[in-house]
A protein has these predicted regions:
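Zn-dependent metallo-beta-lactamase
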Residues: 1-56, 61-65, 69-72, 170-173, ...
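Metallo-beta-lactamase
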Residues: 76-79, 84-90, 94-106, 121-186, ...
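Active-site beta-strand termini and strand-to-loop segments that position acidic
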Residues: 48-51, 198-202
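Cap/insert and terminal regions of metallo-dependent hydrolase folds
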Residues: 72-83, 200-283
Length: 283
């Protein structure tokens, strides 16, 4: 097995929204903001090469939307999904599976693209697209709070193409899925049934954190995004996960942290905190 970091692009979001009730005087120590209160973020996906399978975990926000749409998210840098896949030595037609942790636009937008007729179609024509029915139903009949994050042009083409597949939601904790060859944890704080994958690699357990832990600055328990639909649920999910991660020595692959690809954790007098920064090449 091989794992590759795939940078699908970089963007900025309001630091206050990213840290909820935590004062700026605290969160800016780890995530400094610009003059508009925006902090640097990235869309770091992961590519899993396992036998004949090439599984992409998340796909960034893509480039289908209007200039006005992107003006809110201030893209920066030259990274892109297709370029990063090519730089890893693969083509988009070789992708066999796309595992979408959840269907907010910054995680799934790159999975579809506009064709020559300006119609949104799946980018990965030979791939199965994985979600779960609970979350799919949640996203396609969205609540008012999340409606702006669930975009039909990102979702409907996947369903209409016949490439959409659902994982069964299993009991709490990590459960193994033979369909994909790795374990998945379902969490409900950020959105309904977000899927967190865990991959055994080089003798380590690598967990793709998605929005359960957006950046290393979110490790302290109360540091929860204002975007989360159930913040108290996130608090308990983080508590359970972080305790398990320290106990088992997990390596946390950070999707949105612009500065840390992988982090480790350690116990301190103040609770679980940042232990160190690594990359997949270090494992």
């Amino acid at each position: 097995m091989n794992l590759y970091p795939i940078n699908a692009g970089n963007f900025k979001l309001d630091g206050g929204a990213m840290f909820g009730v935590v004062p700026k005087s605290l969160w800016q120590k780890t995530n400094p903001s610009d003059s508009n209160n925006l902090i640097d973020l990235t869309a770091r996906c992961m590519l899993i090469e396992s036998g004949s399978r090439l599984i992409l975990v998340d796909a960034g926000m893509g480039d289908k939307q209007s200039e006005k749409f992107f003006s809110y998210y201030k893209p920066w840098g030259d990274d892109s999904l297709i370029r990063s896949i090519n730089n890893a030595g693969f083509s988009i037609d070789e992708i066999t599976d796309v595992f979408l942790t959840h269907l907010h636009f910054d995680h799934c937008g790159g999975a579809t693209v506009l064709n020559s007729n300006n119609i949104s179609v799946p980018l990965f024509k030979n791939a199965k697209y994985w979600s779960n029915k609970n979350h799919w139903d949640w996203a396609t009949s969205p609540n008012s709070r999340e409606k702006a994050s669930f975009l039909n042009e990102n979702l409907i083409p996947i369903e209409e193409s016949g490439q959409l597949c659902f994982l069964d939601v299993k009991s709490p904790g990590f459960n193994h899925y033979d369909e994909l060859g790795f374990d998945v944890l379902f969490v409900d704080g950020h959105t309904e049934k977000q899927m967190i994958p865990k991959v055994s690699y080089s003798g380590k357990e690598v967990v793709f954190m998605a929005d359960l832990l957006p950046t290393a600055g979110h490790i302290p328990l109360p540091y929860i995004m204002g975007y989360d639909v159930r913040p108290l649920t996130t608090l308990e999910e983080k508590r359970r996960f972080l305790n398990l991660a320290v106990k088992e020595g997990y390596c946390l692959f950070m999707e949105h942290d612009a500065h840390n690809q992988i982090i480790t954790l350690k116990e301190t007098e103040k609770g679980i905190r940042f232990g160190g920064s690594l990359s997949l090449k270090d494992l």
